[in-house]
Amino acid sequence: MKLLFAFISCLLIFGSSLWSKAEGAKPNVLFIAIDDLNDWVGFMGGHPQARTPHMDALAKQGRNFLNAHCAVPVCSASRASVMSGVAATTHGSYELGPRYEQLPALNDVPTLQRYFKDHGYTTISGGKMLHHNFNGRLVGDIDRSLGRNRSPRPKGPMSRPANWSGAWDWGAYPKADAEMADIQLAHNAAKTLKENFEKPFFMSVGFFRPHVPLFVPPKWFAKYEADKIALPKNPKNDLDDLPKNFLHINDYAVAPTHAEVVSGGKQRSLTHAYLASVSFVDHCVGIVLDALKSSPHADNTLIVLWSDHGFHLGEKQHWAKRTLWEESTRVPLLIAGPGIRSGQPCKEPASL
């Protein structure tokens, strides 16, 4: 949370002299968040088969933080830290609640969007940015909404066993990209980027996949050969050095246990679904980036892309998040645009 908030604060202070050729102009900011995306992207090398051409291209254009980690490995708490610049040890959230506006420690702390709005920016937001959206006293932080829709789900279980949580389902559904909320959001953002604005803008775009349930159209599954999906390495004795109580860390989550996944023969198909979802969201990112390139704002817009936390797919015999292993904490973090040096990955530790 320190890195992003410090960087963006510097935009407001030094933006005119660093990035804009026009006297007095401030840089726009395109702020892209991706839910539950771990290091399974090409430029991070987390999985040898991951296909993410658009994010890979962005990584080459700007600064890629290869050792970036979230503040808390769970959606709501991580996003509260990013949007406030306040550590979880101060704001007190380590789970899916309370809402940002319900945390007493954040009563007088503006969201990132409010901070930009107070400094002369038009704030635009869509999709999943804060976990619980901008509600209550936060409603006025956003000048314009790009929408926050839900993607369709099958009427009943598609791939999951009957005793698993409904969130943990996956498969090639629906048939068309156009039915997916992330695609709709990407096109809304792309359309908005074509417009002219009287003030600089701070546009927040929050994509939901690869968060479970892992439903994406068939074309994204077809990018990977199901029987050739590489599975993460998982030594049988990998947990032998852990305290006994730590072995039950997943018992209180909605995710299945590793034993349930393996005994049910679901590991390869779940891994396939995650990779398909990653390629799908990369396509969504590409729609927005391509629109920016052809827009009147291409030469004066900074791009920040990040994920709220990582995700286990069987590593350390764990699924989902909520651990302090790097599979749960390591995230993509990219900053690109005019004035940002390209081709120089940063390997030093960085915190969202």
Regions found by a protein language model. Name each.
Residues 2, 7-8, 20-352:
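Formylglycine-dependent sulfatase
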Residues 12-20:
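C-terminal segment of classical bacterial N-terminal signal peptides
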